[in-house]
Every structure is written in C-alpha cells, then in structure tokens.
C-alpha cells in the first residue's frame, strides 16, 4: 500500500522576502483565474488534461514560437517556469470546480446558495528542487530558496529549525520526498515535506489474527484489548491523559465565563487555543494506541464506526469529544498503515450498552460513568466491556463471511444472537467459535 506522510519544518525568523513572494504568487493565481473564467468554453472542449494545460499555458506565456493572447508575462515578469505552471494548474482547478458546481446547482433547481468564483485565494507556492529549492552545502540545517524581493527573483539562504531537520534525518532519510510547499501557521512559516512509502499490509488468515479493539470513551481516552479469534484476551490497556484534559477543560471554563460576561463576539482566539489543545491530545492518544498495537504484533486495529458527519447538536464539550474521536481514527489509520497493520470498523450500536458476558443491558453508576453494574450484579468497567464487544463483533463478522450459506444457517441456529450484529457481544464469539470447532470435528 502506498502511504504519503508530511512534516512541516519551521523557517527561522530572518530578513527574507517570504511575504512578498507569497503575495505575488497569489496575485498571479488570481489573474489566471480571471483569464480562464473568461475563455473557459474554449478550454472545456479539450478533454485531455495535459493538452488543456498546454493550451492554457500558451494563452498566457510568450515563447519564440508562440505569441500569448494575454499580457500575463508583462504583469509578472521573469516568474520561474515551474512556479508559473503551478499557478496555472491551481487556476485551472479552481475554474473547473466552479463550473462543475454551477452545473450541479442548476440541475438541482437552484437549491441553496449560488456558487461563486473566488479570485482572492489562499494558494501556497511549491518550491521545486534545483529550480526553487536547493539544500545548503555549507550549513547542515540550511537551504536556499528562490524568492521575489520586489524587483526580481533571487536566491536567499534560509535557516531551518534544527530539531525539525534532525527529525527528518532520523526518520525519513532515504525515503522518496516531494517538492516542499510553503505553509503558514500561527504567524510562522514552514516548509512542508511530503514522503511516499510502499508498505505491504498484513495478510494473516482470520483465525490466526491478533487484533487490538479500541473503545474511544468520554471517561477514559481509549481502552485497548488484544484479542485472538477464539476470544482469548492477551492484554488490556487504559490510555488516559488527565493533565491534558484538565488543561483543556480549564480553557473551556474560561471561555464559558467570558461569554457570559461579554458575549461570543470576542472568543475566536480562545476557541482556537482550545482546538489546538484538543488536536494535540488526539495526536498523543493515536500514538499511544498504535504504539501498543505494534508492541503486541497486532494485525488489525478495530474501531467503532462513528456517525459524526454533519451538524452535531449539544454542548461544545461534546463537540470537542467527537472532533477528537474523528481525528484519532484518522491518525491511527495512517500510522497503522505505515507499520503494515490494517484498520477495520464495526457497528457501534449497543457496544457499551450490552454486557460482554451476555447478561443483558448494563446500568451505569450515576457518579462515575466509567463503572457499571451487570444484570447479574457484577461490577465492571464499562469502556473495557465495550472494547471486548468491539473485538468480538469484528471476529464474528470475519468468521461468518466466507462460510457457505447452509453451514452459516446451522451456526446461526445454534447461536441465534449472531444473526443481528447490533446485539452481538463477547460471549457470543466464544460460543460461536466453540460451535465452529465442533462442526468441523464432526
């Protein structure tokens, strides 16, 4: 499987014309968007992307054999060719997207707002190697960038963050790297390097697999269970970062008190800080989950399928929890694929509501929602019970999938609860695996 990872290296503060370069590149993209919007009917006839791009470039760039129709070269003289082509590609994509959205809007009887062609863009330039970007031979943590200083395009030596460069040298040496892209975050500039890897994913048969079932809860950040196909539990781990959550909840409390006094008009920066804390917490949880799975030589990491698309009603705290769950699953998926592990998702209905031993629904403690009481009086951790059920539902699905219909009907007759996936629990997996072994022995 091909995986693409990226890492941003901070540009140290120094007197280089980064802002001027960014402004002229965005101005060039805006100019090209206006040009191609006027003559899109001519370009739309050309279906081949490469031919369309060549035609678009000939319209704005003059050569010995071509006279441009528009004065783009006069407005942006001596712009590097690779940077000009990147701007052309960005402009073509913007206009094409606008035209497609406009057609869809007309087909839907003009429901919703009319699409707009936005020329004021947030495009970021790409520093192509050897043409726009060179590694500094004199300084280990330096590079040379071709920037616009207000008069022309010149080479400038820049210093990069030592810790960021050490990370790249340690973890990404020898990997295929793409051209770096300029990025601005929190009033700082970064060069984002992208790396491509070819990683073979595990192909272990289901009955020999070891999985890590993960329950992302509100009380504990994550509960991981290492499980085999017969239901044997090899390990359990509670992942929690209480200090980080306390810091975030203190910030949310300050936001709440501020909004009660002054309204919600001036809390944008405070919410941005809370979101950054939430994102950092998601990174730590995802790293802990994949690290624990790798320690136990796991083949598949199993999550609940969370229906978190669209608008979510409720308090901001709950929204932050849902944002973090989505972020954790995305990060875990990427990190697991880099390590050769697979990701699977199961139906989340009733995983926490039903006891893992098959005794029925659980009753959560009113004071501590992480603990619950089973119908038989047993006290247990609710998130741990849910992680057992998550792993069991994965194995029940994968064990029954390749079996012929007649054999599956016999098994479902002996274990009726596996017919409905939303009611399957850990005890059903143990019973199903035992019946499969008896059927095979017979």
Question: What feature does the model see in each segment?
Answer:
Residues 1-442:
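Nucleic-acid substrate recognition interfaces
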């Amino acid at each position: 499987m091909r995986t693409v990872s990226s890492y941003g290296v901070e540009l140290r503060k120094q007197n280089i014309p980064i802002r001027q370069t960014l402004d002229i590149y965005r101005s060039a993209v805006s100019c090209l968007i206006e040009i191609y919007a006027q003559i899109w009917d001519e370009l739309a006839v050309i279906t081949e992307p490469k031919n369309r791009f060549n035609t678009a470039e000939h319209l704005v760039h003059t050569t010995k054999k071509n006279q441009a129709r528009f004065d783009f070269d006069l407005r942006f003289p001596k712009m590097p060719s690779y940077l000009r082509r990147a701007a052309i590609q960005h402009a073509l994509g913007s206009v094409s997207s606008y035209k497609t959205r406009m057609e869809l809007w007309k087909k839907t009887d003009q429901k919703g707002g009319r699409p707009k062609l936005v020329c004021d863009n947030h495009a970021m330039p790409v520093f192509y190697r050897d043409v726009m970007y060179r590694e500094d031979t004199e300084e280990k943590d330096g590079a040379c960038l071709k920037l616009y200083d207000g008069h022309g395009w010149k080479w400038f030596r820049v210093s990069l963050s030592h810790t960021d460069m050490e990370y790249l040298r340690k973890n990404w040496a020898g990997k295929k790297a793409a051209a770096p892209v300029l990025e601005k975050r929190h009033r700082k500039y970064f060069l984002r390097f992208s790396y491509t890897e070819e990683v073979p994913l595990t192909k272990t048969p289901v009955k020999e697999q070891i999985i890590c079932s993960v329950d992302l809860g509100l009380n504990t950040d994550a509960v991981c269970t290492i499980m085999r196909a017969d239901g044997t539990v090899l390990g359990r781990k509670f992942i929690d970062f209480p200090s980080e959550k306390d810091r975030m909840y203190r910030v949310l409390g300050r936001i709440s008190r501020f909004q009660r006094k002054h309204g919600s008009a001036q809390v944008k920066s405070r919410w941005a800080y809370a979101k950054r804390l939430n994102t950092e917490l998601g990174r730590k949880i995802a790293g802990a989950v994949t690290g624990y799975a790798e320690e136990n030589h796991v083949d598949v990491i199993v999550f609940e399928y969370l229906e978190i698309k669209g608008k979510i009603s409720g308090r901001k705290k709950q929204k932050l929890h849902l944002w973090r769950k989505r972020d954790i699953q995305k990060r875990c998926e990427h990190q697991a694929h880099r390590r050769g592990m697979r990701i699977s998702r199961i139906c989340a209905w009733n995983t926490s509501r039903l006891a893992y031993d098959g005794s029925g629904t659980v009753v959560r403690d009113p004071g501590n929602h992480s603990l619950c009481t089973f119908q038989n009086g047993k006290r247990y951790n609710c998130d741990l019970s849910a992680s057992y059920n998550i792993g069991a539902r994965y194995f029940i699905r994968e064990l029954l999938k390749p079996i012929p219909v007649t054999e599956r009907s016999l098994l479902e007759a002996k274990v009726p609860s596996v017919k409905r996936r939303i009611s399957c629990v850990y005890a059903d997996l143990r019973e199903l695996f035992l019946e499969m072994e008896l059927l095979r022995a017979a």
